[in-house]
């Protein structure tokens, strides 16, 4: 077997994808025969050091979680030459799933169940003191058994972090991300709301960082919040969307973090309430009136 088919003590089974400076493979540990997902980043130039640091941060953060919705992070391997790190390999749980952008839910109840699981995973992250900061359809994997996995902790950070660079995804990015203000759990609430909107309406919401191209990856420049028109409510775009779910999404994507729901726990509770309504349509639907009144 040629060296190109191995990375350290791991044999490459398949290429799963790639990022800006990373490649992701399905691999097998040659010693234990266990199968993993491996993210590999090579430092070819000095400017690549930040991509190495990003993977190291992804390991440091991911290793602190233990939740079924968050992809498990196993270990980080540094490949050195002359005492200098030339590349890193992040060994992660191999998830057999399809991203949400490629396999949309076939029912509103199915969509709400996906949203609820994502919110549960984010609630766990917040409880450990971290924010994901890049929730979007491509970072959500759907498994055959109905489970969900949140992936890609490359933008994750401690609650309250003020980043030096604008990071996030146009079309999903909260105003505080585009304006380099403190990242908090309410940032994830906005990102989740923007993702829910896209899933149900198939359009990105108007954000302070709108996409320049159709792939939602190119920044067009940050706008002021006063220049942004509120999105049309989902149920007005798609009449199949329940008004309670539409209200939930609109609450999440408020431009001012103070106007969003108080916590991800509130989101979880509301989504459970909405699921109850969808499963029991003959019963009167409760009104969501505030952060504390979520189970009335």
Question: How should each PLM-predicted stretch be described?
Answer:
Residues 72-88:
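Short beta-strand micro-motifs within the conserved protein kinase catalytic domain, predominantly
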């Amino acid at each position: 077997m040629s060296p190109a088919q191995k990375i350290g003590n791991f044999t490459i089974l398949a290429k799963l994808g790639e990022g800006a400076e990373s490649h992701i493979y399905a691999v097998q540990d040659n010693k234990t025969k266990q199968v993993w997902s491996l993210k590999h980043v090579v430092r070819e130039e000095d400017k690549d050091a930040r991509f190495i640091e990003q993977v190291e941060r992804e390991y440091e953060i991911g290793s602190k979680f233990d939740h079924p919705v968050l992809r498990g992070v196993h270990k980080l391997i540094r490949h050195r030459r002359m005492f200098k790190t030339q590349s890193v390999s992040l060994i992660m749980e191999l998830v057999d799933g399809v991203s949400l952008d490629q396999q949309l839910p076939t029912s509103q109840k199915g969509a709400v169940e996906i949203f609820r699981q994502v919110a549960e995973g984010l609630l766990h992250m917040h409880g450990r003191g971290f924010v994901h900061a890049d929730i979007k359809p491509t970072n959500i994997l759907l498994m055959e058994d109905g489970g969900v996995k949140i992936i890609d902790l490359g933008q994750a950070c401690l609650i309250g972090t003020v980043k030096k660079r604008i990071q996030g995804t146009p079309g999903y990015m909260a105003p505080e991300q585009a304006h380099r203000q403190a990242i908090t759990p309410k940032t994830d609430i906005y990102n989740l709301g923007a993702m829910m909107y896209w899933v149900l309406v198939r359009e990105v919401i108007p954000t302070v960082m709108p996409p320049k191209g159709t792939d939602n990856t190119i920044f067009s420049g940050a706008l002021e919040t006063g220049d942004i028109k509120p999105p049309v409510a989902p149920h007005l775009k798609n009449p199949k969307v329940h008004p309670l779910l539409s209200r939930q999404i609109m609450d999440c994507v408020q431009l001012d973090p103070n106007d969003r729901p108080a916590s991800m726990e509130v989101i979880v509770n509301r989504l459970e309430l909405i699921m109850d309504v969808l499963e029991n349509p003959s019963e009167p639907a409760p009104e969501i009136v505030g952060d504390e009144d979520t189970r009335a």
